[in-house]
Amino acid sequence: MKTLILIGGATACGKSTLAKNLCRYIPNSIKYRRYQGFFDIALQKNIPKNEVFQKISSVEVDDWFVNVCNNSEVVISDVHYAVQMNRNEMNTNVNIYQNYVSTISDDLLKKISLKNIRIIAIFLSCSPLQCFTRAISRYSENQKNIRNISVEDATIENLAEEKEWNDILDTGLVDGVKLDSEYFSVGQLTDQCLKYLNNNETRKLIRIKTDE
């Protein structure tokens, strides 16, 4: 069954690391972010990079992403379930209390579901202090941008991410599982994901047979 696996959570919770490792263990899987659609569409249409967000709509990107999922056996996508608009790196002048918005719309989920693609949303749970500590360490090692300016900032982000993840599950179009990335290694998390995916697929097959 074609599958989209979303792996989300707060900054530095381990999303990309788990996505990369899962891709190694799931046959015929690819890593692809919806956001990449902006640039792939731009390349196809010869749109300059500085005009990407003016000339390409979110609906176009959604449709592109659905097409990627429909043409792939398994798509693994590390995501932020919630973001503060116009903020992607640390800025000490930013208002950390500004509203978060969902990155995964109901319309996108419906479009994917209509293609009979199974959607699994994983939430990586990690304490705000640990996430903030990891982000600072990551910046010190490779100068990679970080977005949180304090543990309070990381706490607000964590709560927003989990709220939007729960809202996605409430649509009834998505199955999901919450995993602890603070106390489990990437290898252990990978094993837990694979076990969940196998169990979920078995339940889906039983449900289909029951409905026939």
Language-model-detected regions and their locations in the chain:
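Switch/connector loops and helix/strand junctions flanking conserved nucleotide-binding motifs
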Residues: 84-87, 128-136, 188
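Hydrophobic anchor at the beta1->P-loop junction of P-loop NTPases
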Residues: 7
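Walker A/P-loop
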Residues: 16
